[in-house]
């Protein structure tokens, strides 16, 4: 807990310093319509597996985990640009550790609501992987200690506070789904369910613009 508090204080002090620097900077605001900027971002926050999880003890849903993400993206204010993102999720379900990964390209639309507030919507399509680590648990087609590969989709929307020309702090809400393909004999679930796993979440984001 002490480390978390110290980290929050450090981030807060950086934000104040960046804001002070921005107010003293008389250069033209780079975040205007038509401007193309590169962004490197890191994010962390809670997430929930919102598809059914079948175990030897019954069905579970909305299982909480932790989401980590890194994204390199172009931001065209008032337009669409592209990027690439990687996300990793860890969820513990009654002793079963489920690891989910996503990597793929994305398209991002950005809109400047105010001189200091930037909105973003992203859509991605890429590779998804899943792995479960407990021999008595399964999540749909997730096999124990075996990495499952599938088609991953990502939809995200967020808001960014532009602390300076190069620093931003934001909040993202996202939905990710991994489709594993055709069902087989190892599938756990109802006949009308897809063979896949989905999760929703919210993350705090640190942006570096250049």
Can you describe what each PLM-predicted range is?
Residues 1-4, 19:
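Positively charged n-region of N-terminal signal peptides that target proteins for export
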Residues 23, 158-210:
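Predominantly the C-terminal beta-signal and adjacent terminal strand-loop region
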Residues 51-53, 90, 138-143, 186-190:
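Extracytoplasmic loops and strand-loop junctions of Gram-negative outer membrane beta-barrel proteins
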Residues 54-56, 96, 133-135, 183-185:
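Outer-membrane beta-barrel and related beta-rich outer-membrane complex signature
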């Amino acid at each position: 807990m002490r480390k978390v508090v110290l980290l929050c204080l450090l981030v807060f002090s950086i934000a104040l310093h960046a804001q002070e620097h921005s107010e003293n900077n008389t250069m033209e605001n780079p975040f205007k319509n038509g401007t193309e900027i590169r962004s490197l971002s890191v994010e962390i926050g809670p997430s929930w597996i919102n598809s059914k999880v079948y175990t030897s003890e019954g069905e579970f849903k909305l299982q909480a985990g932790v989401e980590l993400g890194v994204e390199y993206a172009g931001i065209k204010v008032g337009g669409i640009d592209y990027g690439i993102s990687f996300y990793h999720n860890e969820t513990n379900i009654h002793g079963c550790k489920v690891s989910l990964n996503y990597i793929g390209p994305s398209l991002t639309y950005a809109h400047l609501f105010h001189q200091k507030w930037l909105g973003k919507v992203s859509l991605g399509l890429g590779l998804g992987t899943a792995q479960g680590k407990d021999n008595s648990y399964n999540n749909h087609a997730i096999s124990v200690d075996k990495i499952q590969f599938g088609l991953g989709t990502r939809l995200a929307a967020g808001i960014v506070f532009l602390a300076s020309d190069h620093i931003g702090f934001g909040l993202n809400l996202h939905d990710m789904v991994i489709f594993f393909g055709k069902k087989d004999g190892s599938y756990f679930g109802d006949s009308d369910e897809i063979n896949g796993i989905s999760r929703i979440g919210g993350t705090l984001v640190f942006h570096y613009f250049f």
